[in-house]
């Protein structure tokens, strides 16, 4: 949009970011960034490779810093990379200005190695294929991938078989590292947020752990609600 198609000038993009996409012109640019710029999680090699490149820089940099076990035996010695942000993506996003993908300031970043919410538009297979391109053999601190489907989707036996085949393909053919699911509808989560007394037993998968939905901060609740609901 900026350097190839030249639909947006660098100055226009920078001003829109500083404006946090609040003015009418900034909102026009934000809409283009969200809808017209390709995103990670859709099995687009050119885009996914950018994520791989950033991960490789991160991994190589981490190797430069010995830990307290350095020189004390074969186990340990260096620090290692991981993508398990748990729910820190919410707090980290709160301290991050607007970004050139159209994300507004102070909103959550993408969690773990998951695509940004609602940006993975080509279904779960495309997400798995994008994630499989990451150098997971080097990310020994964990590779966190969150996915969400609705109970209605899994109420059909054929869909249960589809998701079983999808998961097997991810791990057996694409050499996947990790995936975890929430099986709950957006409507249920919104109702639980509005009427917590009616959903005291609602448990959700946050990241590397599960928790009662009602005990989570509203920001973390909103982040879980915003996750893409996948279809098959």
Listing of model-derived features with the role each one plays in the protein:
Residues 1-232:
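Acidic, glycine-enriched catalytic cores built around paired aspartates
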């Amino acid at each position: 949009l900026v350097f190839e198609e030249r639909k947006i000038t660098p100055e226009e993009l920078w001003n829109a970011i500083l404006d946090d996409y609040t003015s009418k012109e900034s909102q026009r640019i934000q809409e283009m960034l969200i809808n017209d710029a390709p995103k990670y999680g859709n099995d687009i090699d050119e885009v996914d490779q950018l994520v791989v490149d950033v991960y490789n820089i991160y991994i190589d940099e981490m190797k430069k810093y010995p830990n307290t076990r350095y020189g004390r035996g074969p186990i340990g010695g260096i620090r290692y990379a991981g993508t398990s942000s748990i729910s820190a993506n919410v707090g980290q996003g709160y301290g991050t200005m607007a970004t050139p993908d159209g994300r507004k300031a102070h909103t959550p970043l993408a969690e773990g190695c998951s695509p940004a919410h609602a940006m993975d538009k080509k279904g779960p297979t495309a997400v798995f294929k994008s994630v499989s391109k990451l150098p997971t053999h080097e990310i020994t601190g964990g590779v966190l991938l969150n996915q969400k489907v609705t109970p209605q989707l899994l109420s059909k036996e054929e869909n249960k078989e589809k998701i079983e085949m999808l998961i097997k393909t991810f791990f057996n053919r694409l050499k996947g590292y990790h995936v975890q699911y929430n099986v709950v509808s957006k409507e249920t989560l919104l109702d639980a947020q509005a009427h917590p007394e009616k959903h005291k037993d609602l448990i959700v998968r946050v990241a590397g752990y599960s928790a009662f939905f009602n005990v989570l901060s509203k920001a973390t609740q909103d982040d879980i609600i915003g996750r893409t609901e996948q279809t098959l």
